[in-house]
A protein has these predicted regions:
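An alpha-helical support segment within catalytic cores of ATP-dependent transferases
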Residues: 4-23, 132-190, 200-202, 247, ...
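Active-site acidic catalytic loop and adjacent metal/ATP-binding pocket
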Residues: 31-55, 172-220
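ATP-binding pocket architecture of kinase catalytic cores
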Residues: 32-33, 37-141, 164-165
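A glycine-centered beta->alpha junction motif in the catalytic cores
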Residues: 59-60, 98-114, 132-135, 148-158, ...
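Short glycine- and hydrophobic/aromatic-rich loop-to-beta-strand nucleating segment
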Residues: 95-99, 192, 229
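Extended, well-ordered alpha-helical scaffold segments
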Residues: 119, 162-174, 280-295
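Active-site activation/catalytic loop segments of kinase-like enzymes and analogous catalytic loops
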Residues: 219-250, 260-279, 293-294
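ATP/Mg2+ or Mg2+-diphosphate-binding catalytic cores
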Residues: 269-311
Length: 311
């Protein structure tokens, strides 16, 4: 990894200088937060200067799942809105992006931080502003993503649960119900996990990690955010009111069926990391197991079919 970082910094020498200092900034943790496992981050300082830059190296294990150029363009657009650190330059050969580093006083958000109504409302307002802008230029569907990941894990020696095919079998009726109901496609950050939000002074928020940025159904992102922050549907419903200005069962049902699909997607993506990564213990399997469990519980709810009909 040090060699990759040094090669990337050499490519960025016009910005960081000939002899920059760098240090690992973010340690990867797959479970329970899935934080910094698909990239490595370094604080970078010019010679005899303070750390002003952040170097992000995309993980080789997911290179075929991420469009780095789309991510860089999305990050640039979000920065212009005031929603993210500035991406300065991207190098395709190194799969490296250099950002302006957030100053001291910023930290990675936790779920408890974002459960607070004011912060949740601010995140939704940021997402709506992004959605009102021009398209990212890369259309994505969680169902297409599941198909892609399933082909990878089924071809490998992945540790799939016994009911994995049952969970997969639900994706077709969910997809068909969403398509039959019709949906809009809007630009989005696409991955509202707490670890992709930074908290700063004066309640400031910034979005990071743009690998999932795409043109998507906004209710997918909202459903993911609900599922990330809250355990009970009674807690989730106010987020829909913040987003739409009013609550409707139809929109809420769409969010919830998307949440089930998202859990399956990230369970499978974790298994892809388990298959492709050097031995790292059981963290990826633990995270996959948690996402499979949550998907299983949602699909198994007595009223889940009624949610599909409500679309």
């Amino acid at each position: 990894m040090e060699e990759r970082a040094e090669n990337a910094l050499l490519a960025f020498s016009a910005v960081v200088g000939a002899r920059p200092a760098y240090a690992l900034s973010t340690a990867g943790v797959a479970s329970p937060s899935y934080h910094a496992v698909e990239s490595s981050g370094f604080s970078v300082a010019s010679a005899e200067g303070e750390a002003r830059y952040f170097l992000r190296l995309g993980a080789d294990e997911v290179a075929d799942l991420v469009d780095d150029e789309v991510a860089f363009a999305a990050g640039t657009r979000f920065h212009k809105l005031g929603f993210s650190p500035e991406p300065i330059v991207y190098d395709s050969r190194a799969r490296a992006t250099l950002f302006c580093r957030l100053a001291d006083g910023w930290r990675t958000a936790k779920i408890d931080d974002l459960m607070q109504p004011a912060r949740a409302a601010r995140l939704i307002e940021m997402q709506k502003t992004i959605a009102a802008g021009v398209p990212v230029g890369h259309r994505w569907s969680v169902f297409d993503g599941i198909d892609e990941l399933w082909s990878i894990v089924s071809a490998g020696d992945a540790d799939l649960p016994g009911d994995a095919e049952w969970m997969l079998s639900w994706m077709r009726p969910i997809r068909e119900a969403v398509a039959a109901a019709g949906f809009d496609v809007k630009p989005a950050h696409g991955d509202p996990q707490a670890s992709n939000v930074m908290l700063g002074p004066n309640e400031s928020l910034q979005l990071v990690d743009f690998d999932m940025a795409a043109d998507i159904d906004p209710y997918y992102q909202l459903g993911v955010q609900m599922n990330e922050l809250y355990q009970f549907e009674s807690q989730m419903k106010p987020l829909l009111e913040m987003h739409d200005g009013a609550f409707t069962e139809k929109a809420f049902s769409r969010c919830r069926v998307y949440a089930a699909a998202d859990d399956l997607y990230w369970a499978l993506r974790s298994l892809v990391l388990e298959l492709r990564s050097p031995p790292r213990g059981v963290e990826f399997l633990k995270y996959a197991g948690w996402r499979f469990l949550r998907c299983r519980m949602l699909l198994g709810q007595p009223d889940f079919e009624s949610k599909l009909r409500a679309l």
